[in-house]
Each structure stands twice: as C-alpha cells, then as structure tokens.
Amino acid sequence: AVAESLTNIVWAPLAQGLDSVSLSANWMWPCRSQEGEDARLYEGVKALSDFCCDLHINVPTGKDSLSMTQQYPDGEKVISPGTVIVSAGGEVNDVRKVVRPVVVNEPNSKIYHLDFSSLAPQLGGSAFAQTLGYVGSDVPTVADAAYFRSAFAAVQVMVQEGLLLAGHDISAGGLI
C-alpha cells in the first residue's frame, strides 16, 4: 500500500522529492470479531512502519476501523478482510509539470517499464494479467527500500526536467 501510494505521487514534481511526502494510513481490520486479528494487525502496522522508516518518510496521521463486521437480519455475518489504505501528500513546486497518465502519440517515443522493486517482474492481480485470463499469485512487492528510494528519485529528476510524456504506476496494470 505504501509503494502504491508513492508510485501514484511520483508523477508530480515534489519540492524535495520523497522527503516532501507524508502518508496517512487507514486501517480497516476485523479485530473485534476474529481471534488472532489483533496480532495480524500489529504485524501489518509494524511492517508498514519499518518500511516507512527505511524510506525516511513519516506517517503522521491515520485512522482505524476495527469492527468490520456486518450482521444481517437472517443471522448471516460477513467479516471483512484486514486492509490498509495509504494516501500520500506532498508539496508540489510546479503543478504545470505534473505528468499525466495518458499515452501521447509522439513519433519516435518509447514506452519503458521502470522497476521500483529490483525483483523479477510480477503481475499477479494486475488488470493486465486479468486481460490475459491470468490472475496469478506472484504480486509486485518491494524488497529493498534503498532501491525504491533511488528509483523514485530518478523519476523525480525526469519529471522536474520535463523528460516524460506520460506515466502511470503498474499496480493497476499500467506502465511506468
């Protein structure tokens, strides 16, 4: 969720790159209705916190919803899965330089996939994989925070210098 929010905001010319970014985490977890969910929530919060510390970014705000259970009149009970939604915000120094997610028909231009994870390509769960009739279990992840930070900084240089025609994160099946 952290990488997703950051690869969404990377297309804006941030005043101080990744150091400009603050995150908000909204935890929706069924702690009140499922045994063991408190521990899973703790592990999730710790993993998010550790990753953010490794990236040198803060999470000064957030929210929790810990019930996440719906009881119907017929007695059926539906328990939502644990989820975190992360939003990113930061100071933009020139809104006119924001790179839009629309492919531009420009002769001699190229489409590149920029790797933020340093791992083998993984498309499990992406819209692209689904169009091929494949859902997959290998979903994109980030194993090296320093590599991610470096990739983020490289894209920021290209955004600031106006070198990109279009950009979109790969989480929804798009290309960076």
Where are the language model's segments positioned?
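Glycine/proline-enriched, intrinsically flexible loops and inter-domain linkers
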Residues: 1-176
